[in-house]
Design a protein with these regions (language model features):
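Glycan-recognition and catalytic cores of secretory/periplasmic carbohydrate-active enzymes
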Residues: 1-2, 6-286
Length: 286
């Protein structure tokens, strides 16, 4: 849920003019506010975040209207003694990104979102621990470092506070080459946001630019470091299960990173001996 709020907000920060031209800005703001409000209400103290309602295994065995549900409404939460840095940091990222969306439209609400985001990030970082509350159903397989970097990048973008960039720079050893961007693995998103800052002159973020390039190379047919296959029709084939969610999120990264490179005057991405132009990168999405 928090990841969805993050991506909807990212779409607005990058494509507000286009969304507005399609008369969808009000709708997407309403969706973001709905999700953000839920996260705000779930954040009941500086070190308490309610993370889930219900037993996922039981719920998935019975598809029905919420009004008819009689499965257990078990509550899960994270605290300082039972941490879950992944979910706290992702909630921080979501609220920071949403605060940008409402900065002009509703400045008081934007400030509130940012305050909670900072508290959640501090909670996630100070009480580091992997979220195991409802495993084996909703587990973190990538660890919590990706969410901490992702949240720090959004907090910098929302606040302009250089301490968040310094956090990312001092923890660049966490950054990994990946071929997936998903609700569980945020490295490619963090790398894309931080690569933009590198291209604007923040040279201590060079590893994130390398990571963002690596993500492109992992997806591009003909790349020497290709990791993702395509279907006969050209669709990225990342996972056997629920593939389109990974295709959609990967496509978003490729589009936004292409936009970032164009703005920085960079013509493409070098993958081994082969150079992929911005046009070629975008063609994989057609």
């Amino acid at each position: 849920m928090a990841f969805s709020v993050s991506l909807l907000s990212w779409a607005v920060t990058e494509y507000q003019t286009e969304i507005s031209a399609a008369n969808q800005l009000g709708h997407i703001r309403s969706a973001i506010r709905w999700g953000a409000e839920y996260l705000l209400r779930a954040h009941t103290s500086s070190t308490t975040l309610y993370t889930q309602v219900g037993d996922a295994n039981r719920d998935h065995q019975c598809w029905e209207r919420p009004e008819d549900m009689d499965t257990p409404r078990t509550l899960y939460k994270i605290t300082s003694s039972s941490p879950g840095s992944e979910v706290a940091a992702e909630a921080a990222a979501a609220l920071a990104a949403a605060s940008i969306v409402f900065k002009v439209a509703d400045s008081k609400y934007s400030d509130r979102l940012l305050r909670h985001s900072k508290l959640l990030f501090e909670f996630a970082d100070k009480f580091r621990g992997s979220y195991q509350g409802s495993c084996p159903f909703y587990c973190s397989y990538s660890g919590y470092q990706d969410e901490l970097l992702w949240a720090a990048a959004w907090l910098y973008k929302a606040s302009g506070d250089n301490s968040y960039l310094n956090y990312a720079a001092s923890n660049d050893g966490w950054s990994q080459a990946v071929s997936e961007f998903s609700w569980d693995n945020k490295f490619a998103g963090a790398q894309t946001l931080l690569a933009k800052e590198f291209l604007k002159g923040k040279t201590n973020l060079a590893k994130y630019k390398t990571g963002a390039d690596s993500f492109v190379c992992a997806l591009m047919p003909g790349s020497s470091s290709l990791q993702i296959k395509t279907t006969p029709g050209g669709l990225l084939y990342i996972r056997d299960s629920s593939n389109l969610q990974y295709v959609t999120s990967s496509s978003m990264i490729l589009l936004i990173y292409s936009k970032i490179l164009i703005s920085a005057g960079v013509r493409g991405v070098q993958c081994g001996s082969k150079d992929f132009s911005i046009t070629t990168i975008k063609e994989i999405l057609e």
